[in-house]
From Swiss-Prot:
Species the sequence originates in: Haemophilus ducreyi (strain 35000HP / ATCC 700724)
Role description: Activates ribosomal RNA transcription. Plays a direct role in upstream activation of rRNA promoters.
Annotated gene: fis
Listed GO MF terms: DNA-binding transcription factor activity; sequence-specific DNA binding
Superkingdom of the source species: Bacteria
DNA-binding region as annotated in the record: 74-93
Protein family per UniProt: Belongs to the transcriptional regulatory Fis family.
NCBIfam families xrefs: PRK00430.1
Keywords: Activator, DNA-binding, Transcription, Transcription regulation
Subunit structure: Homodimer.
Source lineage: Bacteria, Pseudomonadati, Pseudomonadota, Gammaproteobacteria, Pasteurellales
Protein name: DNA-binding protein Fis
One of the Pfam families matching this protein, by short name: HTH_8
Length: 98
């Protein structure tokens, strides 16, 4: 279940470290690490549409989880996401979810 977290506590991702201990890291740290890894593999080439790539990697699973949480209720999902229902519908269509 998704829980709203206070602004001072960012979204976190639980992972196991090398010693099999659970470590909670802010989502942004994981995004940074993934981007660092991606950019290091480009061999000096400049990526195109990087913003859209990263946004879609985050937005799609977020929409999926919110729609599951709301049991498909688009009005409730839009309210949770802080967007209007028409925008939500466009995003769902973009990702083949609606």
């Amino acid at each position: 279940m998704l829980e709203q977290q206070p602004a001072q506590n960012p979204l976190t991702v639980s992972m196991l470290n090398a010693q099999a201990q659970q470590v909670n890291k802010p989502l942004r740290d994981n995004v940074k690490a993934a981007l660092k890894n991606y950019l290091s593999q480009l061999n000096g080439e400049d990526p195109t549409e990087l913003y859209e790539l990263v946004l879609s990697e985050i937005e799609h699973p977020m929409l999926d989880m919110v729609m599951q949480y709301t049991r498909g209720n688009q009005t409730r999902a839009a309210t949770m996401l802080g967007i209007n229902r028409g925008t939500l519908r466009k995003k769902l269509k973009k990702y083949g979810m609606g």
